[in-house]
Amino acid sequence: MTQFTPKSAALFALSSLTMALLMQACGGSDDARAQTVPPADPIEGFWQSTVALQDCSSGAPLGGFRGLTIFAAGGAATADNNQPPMSKGIAIGTWKKNATGTYVAELRFWRYQPDGAPAGQQRLTRTLTLAADGKTLTGTISSVSLDTGDNAVRTVCGTENGARVGS
């Protein structure tokens, strides 16, 4: 069994102190790391929206749906809605803040025929404005349906009203 002598205790204390100082110098504290993380953008988070669609030319209403979106740090976006899951996939894409303070999200999802065969892709462009309190948003939507050859077959427009989910 090893006994601690004053010399071994001093060496242990010195090596422990050296290790603690090295960890601190390398960013071992939350304070050191927090200074390097940029502030979150106000749009980041989980949102629920209500969307009203219309024919872009005539303005005739085409129905609507409720949707969920996650705007992630760094500009990634993921969205889904309450439309039948067998008709479409989840929407993925990107978002960015414009110089005017509005946001543009570009998303895409796969569309399917009733028998499950591929029908093409849907491309969405959402232009969003956050309220001053950061808890609600409004926006416009432009949507282009593409066939399996990437030819435009339908264009739909819409409006969106959303609220942040959680804090």
Show which residues each predicted segment covers.
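Tryptophan-anchored aromatic micro-motifs
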Residues: 39-61, 91-93
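Hydrophobic/aromatic beta-strand elements that line small-molecule binding cavities or substrate pockets
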Residues: 66-71, 91-97, 122-132, 141, ...
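Acidic, glycine-rich flexible loop segments
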Residues: 105-134, 138
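Bacterial Sec-dependent N-terminal signal peptides
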Residues: 21-39
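Bacterial N-terminal signal peptides
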Residues: 12-24
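Bacterial N-terminal signal peptides that target proteins for export
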Residues: 2-13
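Edge beta-strand at a domain terminus
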Residues: 100, 141-167
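N-terminal glycine/threonine-rich, aromatic-flanked beta-hairpin/loop signature
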Residues: 59-102, 109-110, 136
